[in-house]
Design a protein with these regions (language model features):
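Charged/polar low-complexity intrinsically disordered regions
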Residues: 195-198
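Long, acidic (Asp/Glu-rich), low-complexity accessory segments flanking structured domains
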Residues: 2-108, 114-191, 203-357
Length: 357
């Protein structure tokens, strides 16, 4: 009897081990170590083309740059078309995907930045990761941050973008505590983006008209709230580039609140009201919502704006779902990638009324 029990336990153990091994190999095929990922975007062409050929997305023919007379409100009074992990087309990251989201009229681009060893040197790169320790990538490749910035400066203010005169917000989630990375990121901003860089800080009173045709750098302070301490240049290092000299806004701050989709949906509804002038609202700060990384569904823009007054709702452009289509319809119907919050509330209130009939 004892031998039968031992045999049974042994069989169960072997089966369980095989299941775990199979799950591990599946994940390993998808998630690879930072130092072993391919540089560049070999294999991404078909992914980007598939996304570009999606006939369900509204034409961007109506989208245009915001007119100066409509841009005189503070930043918090505008909804901005935003993409999440803007270089990601699914399994790959590429400069072609950056060009695509810009061609759709997105003016808030989001990137995860890592610092990895390349040959004998370290360099900042763009990839996608859900690893809390930032040791593994979800994408099968990475691209140098330099390549991403070059794609941005070459496409954001050219005919590629239907709203090329709008300000462009670059949201950098820098996932390292290495001082050298912040120095390298700052150096790339200085050498590539500087001609279009906004001068001075941006706060809750800064008007969009003051940022037209400019790049605004946004650093995610929630990754490392003390990032300024270890990113600070030493007095004797004259060749160091301090990230604080290139940062206009911080997400996770009082000026730009940063929330995950799950955080928002766990809160009670808190609608923003349109004031009696029919132009401004009761919004006190700009709010940014990022989708859940491991969730395939995009946020519901109607709910985000009407129930919570979220101005910047970032979308996964590699997830071609109905919610992305609704986001595209909204910005296309309102003829811009930057739309007054009051207009957005009115637009979705009308849709909400029609849905209840």
């Amino acid at each position: 009897m004892n031998y039968l029990n031992i045999l049974l336990y042994l069989t169960i153990f072997i089966l369980f081990s095989m299941i775990l091994c199979n799950l591990y190999m599946k994940n390993k095929a998808k998630i690879v170590s930072l130092e072993n990922t391919q540089e560049g975007f070999t294999g991404s062409d078909s992914e980007v083309k598939s996304i570009e050929n999606n006939k369900n997305l509204a034409s961007v023919g109506n989208i245009q740059s915001i007119g100066k007379k409509y841009a005189d409100l503070p930043l918090k009074e505008y909804c901005i078309k935003a993409s999440y992990n803007s270089a990601c087309s699914g399994n790959y990251v590429s400069k072609d995907m950056i060009r695509h989201v810009l061609s759709r009229g997105c003016r808030f681009l989001d990137f995860e930045v890592f610092y990895i060893k390349h040959k004998n040197n370290f360099m900042p790169v763009v990839a996608k990761s859900t690893d809390p320790k930032f040791v593994l990538f979800d994408t099968d490749n990475h691209i140098p941050l330099e390549e991403a910035f070059t794609s941005i400066i070459g496409n954001a203010f050219s005919g590629t973008s239907p709203n090329k005169n709008d300000p462009l917000f670059l949201h950098l989630r820098i996932k390292t505590k290495k001082t050298e990375c912040y120095n390298e990121v700052s150096k790339l901003i200085d050498s590539i983006l500087k001609p279009k860089l906004m001068e001075g800080e941006v706060n809750e009173e800064t008007k969009v008209s003051e940022m037209l045709n400019k790049i605004v750098i946004v650093i995610d302070k929630t990754v490392h709230r003390d990032y300024k301490d270890f990113a600070k240049c030493k007095a004797q290092d004259v060749n160091c580039y301090d990230i604080s000299n290139y940062t206009h806004l911080e997400s996770g701050s009082q000026v730009l609140n940063k929330l995950t989709l799950s955080q928002v949906e766990n809160q009670p509804s808190n609608p923003i009201m349109i004031k009696d002038d029919n132009v401004s609202t009761t919004a006190e700060a700009s709010k940014l919502v990022l989708p859940i990384s491991k969730n395939t569904q995009n946020p519901k823009i109607q709910k985000m704006i009407l129930s919570y007054g979220i101005q910047i709702v970032a979308y996964k452009y590699d997830e071609q779902d109905k919610e992305l289509e609704k986001c595209e319809d909204f910005f296309n119907d309102n003829k811009g990638g930057i739309v007054p919050l009051a207009s957005a509330i009115t637009y979705f209130e009308r849709i909400d009324t029609e849905q209840k009939k």
